[in-house]
């Protein structure tokens, strides 16, 4: 014969919430008719309560990028409930909600100490926690919502501790583990998720940044903040693209954009893969950064000037003079340009007034940046275009003089192929290199835009990355960890 024992689940759940104890019931079997053996009369009944319990999603830390005026973040909650060892949904209607713990400031301080971070508590006027999260009978998951206002945030990392509580039903338990949201105005790499190799960037007179890249008729992108880019067309069309001889097999590589004497000047490499004696440098101009660009033909003829593989040009001004640096794995060279930047400055006999070798044969993709009394010559080394086998990376040397000598941090001359590493590959990014001219934001931070393959999608080509350039105590530049990032705080433009 079965004996029925009835429980009040509400009272049991209430006690479990207070004590989290394991309960037992002591039973004794008695009879007025028969004699019960003493050894069989006592029973200890363990009470296993498989109560429904609601928790936040498994992740204890959420990463949130706030790049829109209003960002809505969904937080998943889930209910754990079983019947006869099988998972079931809720067997009652109930409500719960997200709250900010009363000791939020202390939690942020403890988190920072444990994780060696410097996050601030998210300002209360910058977010709104959604209303009650309602579960109907049968539900096993429901979403909560947090709305964050970008205008209330500065460019830094914030932390928001969260807990889940019930709002009236005593038959449901709630996981009181604190979860955290790391919130920032940040970007995700790649900033251009399609092939746009050898990027060059300029801040134009209209307040927009324009990016030009290798490929077709030179794709052009536009951005207000270096993060969100929109494709707007190409610098050339099929009718206006360069047509100077030799034409056969020519492609436009490694564009370099400048603003000279009220004109947008686009230098480009007129090249054939694998034919170093047939690579030259051309120039085109436009009144607008969007084009249309009018081609002016050859600026540097590799054969005529005596530099094989004449590509990867870089324009720089110093002391009222205009210079062009260029070269690829046959030495980096410098020459002086005319005042309009459209021709090589020459002696009366037709020879260049300047032709100087400044780096050895290990380098290409020159980029020069002046800072703190030094000229920093960035370059790329290794193989650029072999997918997962690419060994491309960015290196640097520096000099007190624009024309060198450029040396590494140990004094080794770049003419002898010495260098200091700036950024290399990792498990996510392969072949990072050919950086654009460095851009300084309104807080004085320098930013580097460059290309790389995605290790898990090399077929996408060389996509575009953005990273903050850091400087060590001796004044040498580097990307954090000497590797591309997946994300970071956005540049500050007010």
Model-derived regions, located:
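Carbohydrate-active catalytic/glycan-binding domains of CAZyme proteins
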Residues: 184-494
């Amino acid at each position: 014969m079965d004996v029925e024992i009835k429980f009040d689940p509400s009272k049991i759940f209430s006690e479990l919430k207070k004590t989290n104890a394991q309960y037992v019931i002591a039973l004794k079997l008695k009879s007025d008719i028969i004699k019960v053996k003493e050894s069989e009369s006592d029973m200890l009944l363990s009470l296993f309560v498989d109560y429904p319990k609601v928790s936040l999603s498994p992740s204890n830390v959420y990463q949130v990028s706030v790049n829109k005026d209003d960002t809505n973040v969904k937080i998943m909650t889930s209910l754990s409930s079983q019947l006869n060892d099988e998972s079931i949904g809720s067997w009652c209607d109930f409500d719960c909600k997200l709250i900010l713990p009363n000791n939020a400031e202390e939690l942020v301080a403890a988190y920072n100490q444990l994780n060696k971070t410097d996050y601030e508590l998210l300002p209360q006027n910058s977010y709104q926690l959604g209303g009650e999260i309602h579960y109907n009978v049968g539900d096993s998951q429901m979403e909560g919502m947090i709305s964050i206002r970008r205008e209330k945030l500065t460019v830094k990392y914030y932390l928001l501790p969260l807990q889940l509580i019930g709002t009236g039903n005593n038959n449901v338990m709630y996981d009181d583990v604190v979860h955290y949201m790391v919130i920032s105005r940040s970007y995700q790499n790649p900033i251009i998720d399609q092939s746009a190799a050898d990027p060059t960037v300029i801040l134009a007179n209209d307040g927009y940044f324009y990016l030009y890249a290798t490929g077709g008729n030179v794709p052009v992108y536009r951005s207000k903040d270096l993060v969100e880019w929109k494709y707007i067309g190409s610098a050339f069309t099929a009718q206006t693209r360069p047509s100077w001889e030799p034409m056969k097999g020519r492609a436009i590589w490694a564009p370099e954009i400048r603003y000279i004497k009220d004109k947008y000047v686009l230098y480009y490499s007129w090249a054939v893969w694998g034919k170093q004696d047939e690579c030259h440098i051309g120039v085109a101009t436009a009144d607008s950064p969007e084009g249309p660009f009018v081609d002016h033909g050859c600026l540097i003829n590799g054969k005529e000037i005596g530099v094989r593989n004449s590509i990867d040009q870089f324009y720089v001004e110093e002391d009222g003079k205009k210079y062009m640096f260029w070269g690829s794995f046959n030495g980096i060279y410098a020459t002086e340009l005319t005042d309009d930047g459209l021709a090589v400055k020459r002696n009366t006999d037709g020879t260049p007034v300047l032709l100087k070798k400044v780096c050895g044969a290990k380098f290409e993709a020159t980029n020069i940046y002046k800072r703190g009394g030094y000229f920093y010559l960035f370059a790329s080394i290794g193989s650029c275009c072999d997918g997962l086998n690419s060994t491309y990376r960015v290196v640097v040397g520096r000099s007190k003089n624009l024309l060198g000598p450029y040396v590494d941090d140990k004094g080794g001359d770049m003419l002898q192929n010495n260098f200091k590493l700036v950024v290399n590959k990792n498990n996510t990014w392969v072949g990072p290199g050919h950086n654009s001219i460095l851009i300084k934001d309104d807080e004085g931070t320098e930013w580097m835009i460059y290309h790389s393959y995605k290790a898990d999608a090399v077929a996408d080509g060389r996509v575009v990355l953005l990273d903050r350039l850091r400087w060590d105590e001796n004044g040498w530049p580097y990307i954090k960890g000497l590797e591309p990032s997946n994300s970071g705080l956005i540049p500050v433009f007010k």
